[in-house]
Curated annotation (Swiss-Prot):
Keyword Cytoplasm appears in the UniProt entry: yes
GO cellular component entries: apical plasma membrane; cytoplasm; cytoskeleton; filopodium; stereocilium; stereocilium membrane
Encoding gene, per UniProt annotation: RIPOR2
Parts forming coiled coils: 83-112
Organism: Gallus gallus
Alphabetical GO biological process terms: cell adhesion; cell differentiation; cellular response to chemokine; chemotaxis; muscle organ development; negative regulation of cell adhesion; negative regulation of establishment of T cell polarity; negative regulation of protein localization to cell leading edge
Subunit structure: Homooligomer; homooligomerization is regulated by RHOC and leads to the formation of concatemers through the association of N- and C-termini. Interacts with NCAM.
Protein name as it appears in the record: Rho family-interacting cell polarization regulator 2
Length: 602
């Protein structure tokens, strides 16, 4: 920040005006260089703070375009803006590289929640960088159009001078009229482009750090500071307290940058109700404030430099007035979350998480399963194909509430356990051999199909065990029903199954949420032999499925709960999904305990 040309100091009662120079600095450039020595760049990147209210009564940006273009000033502001945007891009590219390296180091020995949070931070920085690049392209496009209009305007101006010096004639007058019309059009276009570029300058966040006056400031002194930037105003009052402390009625203000316009600062000492002594008034340049890092500025208020105004000025390349405000936490995670919420609009080619519902990214048959969208159906998740698995087909295929073990099992939560048990008992015939069923001819729908495990009460007949060993599964069936009559091989409880295991996901394949859903719907079952061993009992079959149960169902449910945790408070769909997943986990534990008890009874 540099100081303007005029500075005012009060005169004494004898009319003597204090000298305008100090230590040989009498010219404008010398005074500017003297004040530039107080500009310091912060060594660390300061994260965005919570915004304060703006001067809404002054209008958003400039409602009117300037009447006269300022091409030289426009070029200076464009160069400063371009350098600031490039610096912003470099800073965030460095931050992105650091986060990416951190993700590579943590992805092998971290849990899903840590990786998911780090992936969200990386995605937020990437979206912010894409918006910066899009912003830079818009600025360049506007400046190129401005240069074209400037050349046309210069050409029209030279032609107007040439026709004015030529002999007067009717054709010359007509040509001069046409040239004047074109010159006016080009001038208006330049003013319009200046106004459009002014809307892309972002905002200056000015934070009050207090006055520094050495022995000049005494306890009890009161000061008024008035800042004017175009049509924007900021007036604040402060008092010097004991032990060098200062209290001000305002600490932070947001100014919208202007192409033509300097910041004017006036400091007044309040002596009484109607006694105000002007300490000094300065004008500050703003083109040096387009920087990625906060700048601590010390402005000389008087000519001797005995009173300085300390300000911390931070430039944000985007105007975030109408976006979601953030909290005042300045930690790294909070800053990244704020940035993600602030810049969630994105560019046209950059869709964000808020623009798409979580359920719209899933296949249509995951939740609807081919039925109409308006039909109420139980929520289910499909795990991978289990090619050589025994199944228990339903005894009554016309009954929609019945379910069976298949090669693509679903965990269904709609039907209650007493209804399922009643359905299974009614569908199972009360005969275990052809001799006991010779007198009664059952209905075709009551006949058990091949490979069916006949269940009576809580006991499994030998016929069911023999057919389990003889008949391989058919890959056409696709349901598993978590009830008391499910084979123990799918629900055998082990000590290892109660432990949570980290889920390995590839961070280079896109959104982790999509990978998690893909993990739930993909075939990730370890290969099994072509035919299950027949010499063992049902408990022997459970060994082949123990790893599948431990590594797929429990792991997937816990991983899904971790993935839903950050978003279930914001989206109602996630709250319902979280409740369904917890219900699934409870049913799985109850069913596992029930089947373990049944196995002991057998």
């Amino acid at each position: 920040m540099s100081i303007g040309s005029h500075s005012f100091s009060p005169g004494g009662p004898n009319g003597i005006i204090r000298s305008q120079s100090f230590a040989g600095f009498s010219g404008l450039q010398e005074r500017r260089s003297r004040c530039n020595s107080f500009i310091e760049n912060s060594s660390a990147l300061k994260k965005p703070q919570a915004k304060v209210k703006k001067m809404h009564n002054l209008g958003h940006k400039n409602s009117t375009t300037p009447k006269e273009p300022q091409p030289k000033r426009m070029e200076e502001v464009y160069r400063a803006l371009k350098n600031g945007l490039d610096e912003y891009l470099e800073v965030h590219q460095t931050e992105l590289d650091k986060l990416t390296a951190q993700l590579k180091d943590m992805r092998r020995n971290s849990r899903l929640g840590v990786l998911y949070d780090l992936d969200k931070q990386i995605k937020a920085v990437e979206r912010y960088m894409r918006r910066l690049e899009f912003h830079i392209s818009k600025v360049d496009e506007l400046y190129e159009a401005y240069c074209i209009q400037r050349r046309l305007c210069d050409g029209a101006s030279k032609m107007k001078q040439a026709f004015a010096m030529s002999p007067a004639s009717k054709a010359a007058r007509e040509s001069l009229t046409e040239i004047n019309r074109s010159y006016k059009e080009y001038t208006e276009n330049m003013c319009t482009i200046e106004a459009e570029l002014e809307n892309l300058l972002g905002e200056f966040c000015i934070k009050m750090k207090g006055l520094a006056g050495f022995a000049r400031l005494c306890p009890g002194d009161q000061y008024e500071i008035f800042m004017r930037y175009g049509r924007q105003r900021w007036k604040l009052k402060g008092k010097i307290e004991v032990n060098g402390k200062q209290s001000w009625d305002g600490e932070e203000m947001v100014f919208l940058p202007l192409i033509v316009g300097l910041i004017s600062i006036k400091v007044t000492e309040v002596k009484g109700l109607a006694t105000h002594i002007l300490v000094g008034s300065v004008t500050c340049e703003t083109k040096d404030l387009f920087a990625a890092r906060p700048q601590v500025v010390a402005v000389d208020i008087n000519d001797l430099g005995t009173i300085k105004l300390n300000l911390e000025i931070t430039w944000y390349p985007f105007d975030v007035e109408d976006l979601t405000p953030s909290t005042a936490n300045v930690s790294k995670a909070s800053a990244l979350q704020r940035r993600m919420s602030m810049y969630s609009q994105g560019t046209p080619e950059t869709p964000t998480f808020k623009d798409h519902s979580f359920f719209s990214n899933l296949p249509d048959d995951v939740f609807e399963n081919g039925t109409a969208a308006t039909e109420k159906r139980p929520l289910s998740f499909t795990f991978g194909d289990l090619p050589y698995e025994d199944r228990v087909p339903p005894a009554n295929p016309a009954e929609p509430s019945s379910a069976h073990v298949s090669s693509s099992p679903d965990i269904t939560t709609a039907a209650t356990q007493h209804r399922a048990l009643k359905s299974s008992e009614s569908s199972s015939p009360d005969c275990s051999s052809s001799d006991s069923c010779g007198d009664a001819v059952p209905e075709p729908k009551d006949l058990p199909s091949p490979g069916e495990a006949v269940v009576t009460g809580n006991k499994v007949t030998p016929r069911a065990r023999s057919e389990v060993c003889q008949k391989p599964s058919n890959a056409g069936s696709d349901r598993v029903f978590i009830e008391a009559n499910v084979p123990v091989s799918l629900l055998q409880d082990t000590d290892e199954g109660s432990e949570l295991k980290p889920v390995e996901l590839d961070t280079y394949e896109g959104n982790i949420t999509k990978q998690l859903v893909k993990r739930l719907t993909s075939a990730e079952v370890p290969g099994t032999p072509e035919r299950l061993p027949c010499e063992g009992s049902i408990s022997g079959e459970s060994e082949g499925y123990k790893s599948y149960l431990d590594g797929s169902i429990e792991e997937a449910l816990q991983g899904l709960l971790l993935a839903l945790e950050p978003h279930k408070e914001q989206y109602k769909e996630f709250q319902d999904l979280d409740q369904e997943v917890m219900h699934l986990d409870d049913i799985l534990k109850v069913s596992t305990f029930s089947e373990s008890t049944t196995l002991k009874d057998i």
